[in-house]
Amino acid sequence: QKVESLNIDAGKLVLSPTRTYAPVIAKILETHRNKIHGMVHCSGGGQTKVLHFVDDVHVIKDNMFPLSPLFKMIQEESGTDWKEMYKVFNMGHRMEIYMPKEFADDVISICNSFDIDAKIVGRVEKSDVKKLTIDSEMGLFEY
């Protein structure tokens, strides 16, 4: 089946090689290692994977990248609700770096030098409980 908006076969899209983040992460660690509080590769745990690595904070993701047509097709064909989709799939967000906001522009520039789009997708706030909020084009989801 074709992903119409991309004019490519869905199977080829799913099986296309995944980018390795090793070179860009190595470059980021050269200058920012001591500023990084955490890193999460969102494959194998989706957008909720961060919950395995935090305690008593509220992770808020409210500036997500636009959703890829592939994930829209998967959701439509499977009938999976969007909350579950964000739990299972990375939704196009593959790597997260948790660090103070004042260093984000440096890291974004490094990513861009490797031709990788990057941006601040959210923030972490103090909380009495571990919590994740995803505010996306597909809805507001609490985990």
Task: Locate the predicted segments by residue.
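Glycine-/charge-enriched secondary-structure boundary and capping motifs
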Residues: 4-15, 19-143
